[in-house]
């Protein structure tokens, strides 16, 4: 499970150092792809495979599924962190997420999200106002 928020920097070669606490789960391989709200999703290879299987068995007659799958898979890039825990984010994915230097890497349960620092701050400020109200809608009776 991925938890917490970290603030690594993207280097000039487009590499990002993963937080130490995330490395063990990602060291066997990972997949980076487009996420919602212009962030990137990073999945351990096993989790990406599970998602792929779910999408593979879904009916291709559903246009929304075809559209989502095309974007999700065509933007995906597999990688293995180097010995320093760095991954290379391909230029098209960096452009999509607006990643230049300052980044935020968030644990999001079964995935990691990579955000441009300013975009994350804006998103978080927008969500803070409704966060307290969301729990009852999203998790009724759980929290």
UniProtKB/Swiss-Prot annotation:
InterPro entries: MraZ, MraZ_C, MraZ_dom, MraZ_N, MraZ_sf, SpoVT-AbrB_dom, SpoVT-AbrB_sf. Its main location: cytoplasm. One of its GO terms (biological process) is negative regulation of DNA-templated transcription initiation. Pfam families: MraZ. It is found in: Cytoplasm, Nucleoid. One of its GO terms (molecular function) is transcription cis-regulatory region binding. Residues 5-47, 76-119 form the SpoVT-AbrB domain. Keywords: Cytoplasm, DNA-binding, Repeat, Transcription, Transcription regulation. One of its GO terms (cellular component) is cytoplasm. Belongs to the MraZ family. Forms oligomers. PANTHER family: TRANSCRIPTIONAL REGULATOR MRAZ (PTHR34701:SF1). This is Transcriptional regulator MraZ.
